[in-house]
Every structure is written in structure tokens, then in C-alpha cells.
Design a protein with these regions (language model features):
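Short coil/turn motif common to extracellular beta-sandwich-like domains
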Residues: 90-95, 279-287, 346-354
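Pro/Ala/Gly-rich low-complexity, hydrophilic intrinsically disordered segments
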Residues: 39-64, 202, 208-242, 247, ...
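Proteolytic cleavage junctions
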Residues: 225-229, 293-299, 304-365, 375
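Residues within well-ordered beta-strands of beta-sheet-rich folds
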Residues: 26, 97-99, 285-289
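Short beta-strand segments of immunoglobulin-like
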Residues: 83-89, 275-277, 342-348
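Long, low-complexity serine/threonine/glycine- and acidic-rich segments characteristic of extracellular
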Residues: 47, 60-65, 70-213, 313-314, ...
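Proteolytic processing hotspots in large secreted/extracellular or virion-associated proteins
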Residues: 216-217, 257-301
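Conserved, short, structured surface segments that act as functional micro-motifs
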Residues: 1-70
Length: 425
């Protein structure tokens, strides 16, 4: 939406899941539609002299190729000061990450760090500069951070190395190994992290890692039959299942742990592929075989189970239902929805129309309202879970007489509900 200086653009409200009225803005480049950092353009209106703070770093030994402090497991260490004096040891290939936040006087908000730099012996091996993110790379941010750790702790470690399939242009590796540090000499390696904001406020953290030669256990052998590769087209097939993951959708090669659940009377087997959340960069295609005939194949779809049920779409062809998926950690099966959406609890008072509208299966596609035959807008109030029409903003004349209202709800499988009533306004 183009806006101009002095133009009235929004009214703050508090109908969402928020603590106070506020306005969300995204800055995009009009030429590329990249997300861009608003502070690059607004810093003349903001005062910020507060330095970012790093809380801890994480070491990521490469499986089969590196050790950190004698272990192949990832490990975190707190920054009790800006210059850590404890001894760390490493051998082979190790990646690093950092948990850091930025702050600003006059605000209680916790902000992201604009620039993060990792140096080894004075040479920059990795740098991230959060100035822009291409729209098509948005989900790659999951791979830049330690996504698995975030899911468990809600702490965001920014990795100072790039996964093989991560092409975020804001990540800059100064080494041929994507920012992975190679400890191949028995000596002291001097590491330094610098975190800075867009105003130039920065803080530097240092620690020393001693290269200590030691035997590195071999990497666990992986099942080639269960592998998906980040740099090629993948076709994963089992009886009753076809999964197609295109090149460029994975941050790294991943070994699936496929599981199938057979339920009596179900339309298909239920398939899962990974033991925890693993988001793809974009949509992959999944096809499941239908076990028995249904009255209306257009009502079939694929449902994913991952905390909440989600409709993954679906088209039926030659005994298979094909939908889409972008989460390896969910489970998938065929579902059938020929039940219309629910319209209930209609009320008219205080110049407002309210109605409860929902669909517990494929999901609500649309809700349209008409007063005296003319379309009126019903807005969803998230906190209350109802749809509301403010009559003073609608093309409805206040006559003190009866008006007719018609509501039409349609779900994602084309099932339709119609509600009609009268109200005085």
C-alpha cells in the first residue's frame, strides 16, 4: 500500500493477541519486495546509545569431523564477562553460534542484533548483516538460527556458519567451509564475537580455544534409503505414499525416520517422517493412497497433525489424494469433509452484528454478510473468536425499523451454510 507523508494510515486497536494497542509495519523494497530493516530509514527519528548484549555462545562440532571440549555434542557457555578466561579445547571442524539481543533506551522491547561478526586470530570467518531478506528466502531464517534449540527453550542462537542449503544473502562466510572453524594445529586459537546495531553501538566478546589433538569418533552410518538430499530432487516412496521434495527446499541432507500408523476404518495410513519439527523452505508434494471409495471425492483432503490439525489441500486422481506439506515433523493422512461450517450465536446490539463462525475439519474459507441484500464486512475478532460487523461503517441506513441479514459461510471443501435473520436498527 503506497503511503505519503502526513497521510492517516491506521487506527491502533487491541483485538489481537497483544498487551496494548500497537501497529505492525513491514518495510519492503518496491523493486525486489525484499524485507528491509526499517531502522536504516528511521534512525534519524530514534535515539539509541545502548550496546547489544551477548548472553552465551554455542559450539557445534561437525559429526565425525570435530570435537569441542572432548565431546561431539553441541554445548553452550555463558558470557560471564566480555573476555572469558576459562580454557576451551577443540580438534577438527567446529561451528559456532551466539545468543544475543539488542536494546534501546525508552523501550522495553527486545530487538534483534543487526550485525554479528566472528573472527579467528583476527580474521573474519563469518558475518551476518540483517539489512534485507528476500521474500522467497524468508523461511531460511529457521536454518540460520538453531531452530531445534529454539523449539525446546525459546532461546534464539544465531549460527555463525551457513547450512549447505541456506542461501540467505545476509550470511557471509569468510572461509571455504561456510564459516566452520578448522582446529588442525596444536596451538591457541583466539576467537572474538562482535555484535552491533544499526547505530554503530557494539560490544566485543573474546575467548581462547586450545587446539588439542584427539581421536574423533566416526559419524553414525545413515540409511541411504531414508535420505533426502538438499542439492537434488528427492522422490521418497513407500506402499501407499509418495513424497516429492524439490532441490533447494532443505537446509541440509536429512535422514528420515518414517513411521506409519494403520487405523481401522481410516481413509489412508497416517505417515510421519521425522521425530521433531523440521521445516522446509517451501512447499513439497505428498500423495497418499485412498483405502476405500467415498461418496464425493471432491471432499477429500490431506490433514497434517502437528499440535493443531491443518488442511494441506488435496486433489483426487486415480486412487490417490495429492496435497502439499512443508513440515517433516508433522504426520499426514487423508480426511473427508462433507459437513457445512457452523454459524451460531448471532446477535444484534449496540450498532453491531456478531456471529460465531467456524469449521472444525477442512477450515473456513470465507464468510460473507449481506444486509438488505447489500454486502457488509464482517471482521474477525481474534480475542473473542467472533465475527463483527460495525453497522455505522456499513452501507446500512439507521431507520429504527427491521432489516434483513444473510450470512454465507463456505469451508475449504466447498460445503456451504446459510443463516438468515431480522434485526432492528
Amino acid at each position: 500500500f503506497p503511503v505519503a507523508k502526513g497521510q492517516f494510515i491506521a487506527v491502533s486497536g487491541n483485538t489481537g493477541a497483544s498487551k496494548a494497542p500497537h501497529l505492525h509495519l513491514e518495510f519492503h523494497s518496491t523493486k525486489t519486495w525484499d524485507f528491509i530493516d526499517p531502522l536504516d530509514y528511521l534512525k534519524g527519528f530514534v535515539t539509541d546509545t545502548t550496546k547489544p548484549i551477548a548472553h552465551s555462545f554455542m559450539a557445534y562440532p561437525v559429526e565425525g569431523e570435530g570435537l569441542f571440549c572432548g565431546s561431539q555434542r553441541k554445548q553452550s557457555y555463558g558470557f560471564t564477562s566480555t573476555d572469558l578466561v576459562r580454557e576451551f579445547t577443540a580438534w577438527g571442524k567446529v561451528g559456532f553460534g551466539i545468543w544475543a539481543n539488542d536494546y534501546m533506551e525508552g523501550s522495553y522491547g527486545i530487538l534483534g542484533v543487526h550485525r554479528t561478526t566472528l573472527e579467528v586470530d583476527g580474521v573474519t570467518v563469518f558475518e551476518s548483516v540483517v539489512d534485507s531478506i528476500p521474500d522467497h528466502c524468508n523461511r531460511m531464517v529457521n536454518s540460520w538460527g538453531d531452530y531445534d534449540h529454539y523449539c525446546r527453550t525459546h532461546l534464539w542462537y544465531m549460527k555463525s556458519f551457513a547450512d549447505p542449503g541456506n542461501t540467505l544473502p545476509m550470511l557471509h562466510a569468510g572461509t571455504v567451509d561456510r564459516g566452520i572453524v578448522s582446529f588442525d594445529e596444536e596451538r591457541d586459537y583466539h576467537l572474538a564475537y562482535t555484535v552491533s546495531d544499526v547505530f554503530g553501538n557494539s560490544r566485543r566478546y573474546t575467548f581462547t580455544v586450545k587446539g588439542r589433538r584427539q581421536s574423533i569418533p566416526k559419524a553414525r552410518r545413515r540409511s541411504v534409503m531414508n535420505m533426502l538430499w538438499h542439492d537434488r530432487m528427492n522422490s521418497f516412496q513407500r506402499p501407499g505414499l509418495m513424497l516429492f521434495v524439490a532441490k533447494g527446499l532443505l537446509p541440509d541432507d536429512v535422514e528420515l525416520s518414517p513411521r506409519v500408523k494403520v487405523k481401522p476404518g481410516a481413509l489412508s495410513a497416517e505417515w510421519s517422517f521425522y521425530g521433531k519439527s523440521y521445516p522446509l523452505f517451501d512447499w513439497a508434494k505428498i500423495s497418499l493412497r485412498l483405502k476405500h471409495k467415498v461418496k464425493d471425492p471432491s471432499k477429500l483432503y490431506i490433514v497434517s497433525h502437528c499440535g493443531v490439525d491443518r488442511n494441506m489441500g488435496g486433489t483426487f486422481n486415480d486412487g490417490w489424494v495429492t496435497g502439499r506439506m512443508r513440515e517433516l515433523g508433522a504426520s499426514y493422512e487423508i480426511a473427508y469433509d462433507d459437513t457445512p461450517p457452523v454459524l451460531s450465536a448471532f446477535s444484534a446490539s449496540g450498532g453491531r452484528l456478531r456471529v460465531l463462525a467456524y469449521d472444525k475439519q477442512s477450515g473456513l474459507r470465507s464468510l460473507k454478510g449481506y444486509v438488505d441484500g447489500r454486502f457488509v464486512l464482517f471482521e474477525y475478532m481474534e480475542k473473542a473468536g467472533v465475527y463483527v460487523c460495525n453497522l455505522k461503517d456499513a452501507p446500512v441506513s439507521k431507520t429504527g425499523k427491521e432489516h434483513s441479514v444473510k450470512l454465507v459461510a463456505v469451508d475449504e471443501r466447498g460445503n456451504r451454510s446459510v443463516f438468515t435473520s431480522q434485526f432492528e436498527y
